[in-house]
Amino acid sequence: RQRHRDCDKPPDKTN
């Protein structure tokens, strides 16, 4: 849903 700090944290809740 949100991809603001997609590179800072692993893709678990950002995707």
From Swiss-Prot:
It comes from the Eukaryota. Expressed by the venom gland. GO terms for molecular function: toxin activity. Signal peptide: none annotated. Keywords: Disulfide bond, Neurotoxin, Presynaptic neurotoxin, Secreted, Toxin. GO terms for cellular component: extracellular region. It is found in: Secreted. Residues 1-15 form the BPTI/Kunitz inhibitor domain. Its main location: secreted. Neurotoxin T2 is a presynaptic neurotoxin of the venom that exhibits indirect hemolytic activity against human erythrocytes. The B chain is homologous to venom basic protease inhibitors but has no protease inhibitor activity and is non-toxic. Belongs to the venom Kunitz-type family. Heterodimer; disulfide-linked. The A chains have phospholipase A2 activity and the B chains show homology with the basic protease inhibitors. This is Kunitz-type serine protease inhibitor homolog T2 B chain.
